[in-house]
Amino acid sequence: MEMVHADVASLSITPCFPSSLSSSSHHHYNQQQHCIMSEDQHHSMDQTTSSDYFSLNIDNAQHLRSYYTSHREEDMNPNLSDYSNCNKKDTTVYRSCGHSSKASVSRGHWRPAEDTKLKELVAVYGPQNWNLIAEKLQGRSGKSCRLRWFNQLDPRINRRAFTEEEEERLMQAHRLYGNKWAMIARLFPGRTDNSVKNHWHVIMARKFREQSSSYRRRKTMVSLKPLINPNPHIFNDFDPTRLALTHLASSDHKQLMLPVPCFPGYDHENESPLMVDMFETQMMVGDYIAWTQEATTFDFLNQTGKSEIFERINEEKKPPFFDFLGLGTV
């Protein structure tokens, strides 16, 4: 038992001697340091230290045993955890009290009375002490006050519509900086970053509408355009003598009405009824010239009278004379 006490005493922390020395070396160390201490005092100190050490360990063991026992009982029977429930309720109340200030902040639309109050507070404290202003303005945070002022209430805001020059600069700035609206807004004095961002989206929506509408117009024109001849060289072989003129319609504009099928190789009988109906539709000469891009071919039709056209066509259609009997012309 004395040996155990001696070993335990070596672990004690005292200001007179280090813990690594034994009881005999303690006495020698104390003589060198001029500490007056008898062997009885050392022995009593060793006993006191060892008893305190064991009592401390016993207390810790009892505390841990009671702690685990109580938690095991709470797990087995939840009704016994009144104390823990009370603590949980207390912490819940504390947390709810800590968040009560955030819950009281209003997040709705700003009312005119609030705008007026904010203007008065900014005039007094300046546009920088937003937390102090929020304390004077019930229900609003400092961030909300700052955003409301710089985006809506600041008298330096430019509320005029964007000009074409500003729109061009905005598109160039966006190509350089991307979606960094605060940096882009610095290039437009009086414009907020929010207004710059919104107008960029307006420009993009407008361009999208224009492109889609022009695409629809082109598609409609292509669907209404007449059938194009797959052999373009046939247009160079245009022969006015093959025109099957059925009638000459006179109008106020004095434009000649011509049928479409007036090209070599056109077979009217072999066409399907749908193609015949489409080709039989009449077409204005001016539109036809624009379609074929051969305006010089039709100049004589606009300059010659109706009777001259008939006479010339009839003369060219006469078959050549062959003297089979050798009698000559009569």
Curated annotation (Swiss-Prot):
DNA-binding region: 130-152, 181-204
Tissue expression notes: Expressed in organ boundaries.
Origin organism lineage: Eukaryota, Viridiplantae, Streptophyta, Embryophyta, Tracheophyta
Gene that specifies this protein: MYB105
Name assigned to this protein: Transcription factor MYB105
Organism: Arabidopsis thaliana
Main localization of the protein described in the UniProt heading: nucleus
One Gene Ontology cellular component: nucleus
Disruption of the gene: reported phenotype: No visible phenotype under normal growth conditions, but the double mutants lof1 and lof2 exhibit enhanced phenotypes relative to lof1.
Keywords, alphabetical: Developmental protein, DNA-binding, Nucleus, Repeat, Transcription, Transcription regulation
Biological process per Gene Ontology, one example term: regulation of DNA-templated transcription
